[in-house]
Amino acid sequence: MAQKLQADEISSIIKERIEDFELKIDVEETGKVISFGDGVAKVFGLNNVMAGEMLEFDNGDKGMALNLEETNVGVVVLGRGEGIREGSSVKRLGQLLKAPVGEALVGRVINAIGEPIDGKGPIEATEYRYVEEKAPGIMARKSVHEPLQTGIKAIDALVPIGRGQRELIIGDRQTGKTTVAIDTIINQKGQDVVCIYVAVGQKQSTVAQVVKKLEEHGAMDYTIVVNAGASEPAALQFLAPYTGVTIGEYFRDNGKHALIVYDDLSKHAVAYREMSLILRRPPGREAYPGDVFYLHSRLLERAAKLNDKLGAGSLTALPIIETQAGDVSAYIPTNVISITDGQIFLESDLFNAGIRPAINVGISVSRVGGAAQIKAMKQVAGTLRLDLAQYRELEAFAQFASDLDEASRKQLERGMRMVEILKQPPYSPLPVEKQVVIIYAGANGFLDDIEVSAIGKFEYELYSFIEAKYPQIFELIRERKALDDEIKELLNKAIEEFKASFSAE
C-alpha cells in the first residue's frame, strides 16, 4: 500500500517549490515599420535605440539604425528585405554590428557581414569585433620605417610604400589599378603579411577572376576576400570596407603585419550617397552628404604602424579611386588624396602608349615611404625621378627641334631606356634585389648601347645569368640591403660578362 504523505511534508514541498520558482521575463523593445523601400525602413516606437544599433525584423533580416528622428528611426536593411512590409515588427538587439576576425578567415571569401560565400563551409571564428572602432591615437603609433615591397619597379624605386602607410592608387577605368594592387598582394608571399582584398560594387565575374588569379599564384594562402558586389544592397557595399579593416586590425593588434586593398572607394562613396539620399539627409557637393569626408577618413585612419609597446604590428592600406577623364580635382578624389600619405597616379595615355604599369612618375608621390626604402634602392634610384622628369621635358622639346647637341641626345637615349626598364608585365612582381640590379645597370650606362626593343629580353636574361654564375650578388644585396664597393665590383663584372654574350635577336 502506497505511503501517504503527511500534511507537513506537503507544505514543505510546496514551500520548496515556491522558493525555487524563478520568473523569467524577456523584455524586448519593439517597433513597427511605417514605410519600407529601396533598402530603407522607417520604424516607429523604438524610443531608446542607439545610433548604429542592430535591429531584427520579423522576417529574420538584420537592420542598422542610422537616422534617429523625433518620431521615428531610419533603418538600413542588411539583406534583400523580402517580406518586410508596413506594420512588420522590429526589435532591438541591444548591440552594435560585430564581424568575425582571426586566422580562421584566411583563404576565405566572405560577404560584408562576415558570412562565407565561397561554398567551403562555415567559418569557425573564435573572436568577434565591433565593425566601427576608434583609430589608434598619436601615442599608440610609430613612424613608418619598414618597407612593404610591391614587386613593381616603378613603385618600389620612385613611390616607395612602408608598412603602416596609406597609399592611394588613382586613375581612370581600365588603367591597371586593380592589377597594381593584386601584384602587391602576390609579392607578399613568404613575407608574413596577411592581405585583405575588399571588393565594393564590382561585377561578380571580376571578383571571381581576382580570386582565381590569387589562387594561381598561391596568394589565397594568406589572403581574405571581402565582397559586396554591384548587385548587393547599398548598405552592404557601405559596410564592406569597415568589415575588412576590422579583420585587418585583429592582425595589426596581435603584432602581425597586414595589407588591405579597397577596390574601390569611389563606388563606396556612391553607395553611401544612395543610402543618405533615401534617408533624406541633406545633399552637398556632387549630391554627396556632408559627412562623406568622415566616411573615408575614419576608415583610412585605422591603418597604422603601432609602437613597440603595443606589439609593433602594422596595417597598410591601398585605397583605389576611379577618376572620370583624369579629373583628380573632383570631390571624392581630392578628399582621399588629402587623407592618404601619397598617391600612385595611373594615366590612360601612358597605358595606351604601352607603358605599363601606366604610372605617371611626375605626379605620383609617397609622403612617408622614403624612410622605409632600403639603402640599396635609395642608392640606385636617387636621381631616377629627376632624370625621368628631364627626359620628359627633352622629349617634348625634341619633337620640335631636330638638331640636338650630343649631351641632350645621350640624355634622351638614356631616358628611353630607363622608361623601358620600368615596364613590367602584370602578375609578375620582382624581388627588390633584382630591381636594384636592373636599375643600377640602366643608371650606370650599361644599357646605352642596347637596342630599346631588346631591353626586356636583356633584363630577364641578365637575372638568369646572375642566378647561374653570380648568385652571391642577389644574396649580398638581400643581406646587406646596401650597395658597397664589393657588390658594385661584382655587379660591373657580371653585367660586362653578360653583355659580351648577349644577342638582341
UniProtKB/Swiss-Prot annotation:
ATP binds at residues 171-178. Its EC number is 7.1.2.2. It comes from the Bacteria. It is a peripheral membrane protein. SUPFAM superfamilies: C-terminal domain of alpha and beta subunits of F1 ATP synthase, N-terminal domain of alpha and beta subunits of F1 ATP synthase, P-loop containing nucleoside triphosphate hydrolases. One of its GO terms (molecular function) is ADP binding. InterPro entries: ATP_synth_asu-like_sf, ATP_synth_asu_C, ATP_synth_asu_C_sf, ATP_synth_F1_a_nt-bd_dom, ATP_synth_F1_asu, ATPase_a/bsu_AS, ATPase_F1/V1/A1_a/bsu_N, ATPase_F1/V1/A1_a/bsu_N_sf. The record marks 364 as: Required for activity. PANTHER family: ATP SYNTHASE SUBUNIT ALPHA, MITOCHONDRIAL. NCBIfam families: atpA, PRK13343.1. This is ATP synthase subunit alpha. The gene is atpA.
